[in-house]
């Protein structure tokens, strides 16, 4: 968590890569909780595979029950209802604004709505999904304003220059 805090304080993005099951989710939740405790209310966007979303929500509720979290998924109509009820586009962000947890597919479908926010942090679970620079997900994520990015992966990074370049270019587009 201290490493993620250091990244934030230095205005850097990062990749948290270790073996599966070593606590990347809980560490990230602890980090976002730290930011909120310092007055950085967000908004925060966590995206990942559909199969991990309920775990993210339950871990937020378990470790940081005071932080509102929204599982932003469902049919187009269900998402529209959630936008109206939970996701005001007014500024500034208030303490009750939830951490948005959603899937890659919903980000691509609702990119125009999500682009209305200036996210303080974008967390991409299973970040190795971005190893192909030409993938649609990377193209859509570029349109969502984000101050900081963190990729999480339990899959070893391959010694493959195009894949590494894609991940690093997503994190550091100006370098």
Task: Please state what every model-predicted region is.
Residues 1-175:
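ASCE P-loop NTPase motor core, strongest for the SF2 helicase catalytic module
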């Amino acid at each position: 968590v201290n490493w993620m805090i250091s990244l934030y304080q230095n205005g850097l993005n990062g990749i948290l890569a270790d073996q599966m099951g070593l606590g990347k989710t809980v560490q990230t939740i602890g980090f976002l909780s730290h930011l909120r405790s310092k007055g950085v209310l967000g908004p925060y966007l966590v995206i990942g595979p559909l199969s991990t979303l309920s775990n993210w929500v339950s871990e937020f509720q378990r470790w940081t029950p005071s932080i509102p979290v929204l599982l932003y998924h469902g049919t187009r109509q269900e998402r529209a209802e959630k936008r109206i009820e939970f996701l005001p586009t007014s500024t500034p962000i208030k303490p009750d604004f939830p951490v948005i947890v959603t899937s890659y597919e919903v980000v691509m479908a609702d990119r125009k709505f999500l682009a209305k926010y200036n996210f303080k942090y974008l967390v991409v679970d299973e970040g190795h999904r971005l190893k192909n620079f030409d993938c649609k997900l990377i193209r859509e994520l570029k349109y969502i304003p984000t101050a900081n990015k963190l990729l999480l992966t339990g899959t070893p990074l391959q010694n493959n220059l195009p894949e590494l370049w894609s991940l690093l270019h997503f994190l550091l587009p100006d370098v």
